[in-house]
Amino acid sequence: MHRSKLFFTVFLFFLPNFALSEVKQANSVGTSPIPWLSGVINGSYERRINPEIGLGLNGFTWNYVSSDWKFSIFGIGPHGRFYFEEENNGLFVGGSISLMSYSWSGLGLSGSGSIMSLGGEGGYQWKWVNFYNEVTLGLAMAGNIETPDGTSANVGSAIGGIGYKLGWYF
């Protein structure tokens, strides 16, 4: 019990110093909190390979269950960004590729499959010491829904939207 109190006290003492350090950060983690309201859990990791270019990985998952319907989807994919300003602050443009796997069941039927999408985005990132906020405008094109039995449905339509992300550089 005393060890856990000591650890917690040390953690609280050193966390502000670690989180507010002015060291040049090459890594970041972030999330879009607004989709959490509908149960979508998402996150991203990005590493700066030079001051203007970042490469990373995005992922999300969502599960919906009701009395007669169940749906689950998981997506992951790489992304790249070009920042017009150095120090992780300002305008950026980027692109991504995602692979999404889904399954559903309901009304006596079930299915599963995968979807590939290609997307682009532009936005602005505000940095405060190690923390950041960003607003993005994005567009994605989804391919066909492929199922194991060989059937497919074309969902090749554009999906666009405005996004908000917050995160932490380390």
Name each model feature, range by range:
Residues 30, 37, 140-142:
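Transmembrane beta-barrel domains of Gram-negative outer membranes and organellar outer membranes
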Residues 35-37, 49:
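Short loop/turn positions at the edges of beta-strands in beta-sheet-rich folds
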Residues 1-25, 170:
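Cleavable N-terminal export/targeting peptides
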Residues 25-27, 37-39, 70-76, 89, ...:
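Residues that define the transmembrane beta-barrel architecture of outer-membrane proteins
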Residues 44-137, 168:
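Gram-negative (and chloroplast) outer-membrane scaffold detector with strong preference
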Residues 26-28, 104-106, 146-149:
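Extracytoplasmic loops and strand-loop junctions of Gram-negative outer membrane beta-barrel proteins
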Residues 127-170:
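Predominantly the C-terminal beta-signal and adjacent terminal strand-loop region
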Residues 23-33, 95:
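Transmembrane beta-strand segments of Gram-negative outer membrane beta-barrel proteins
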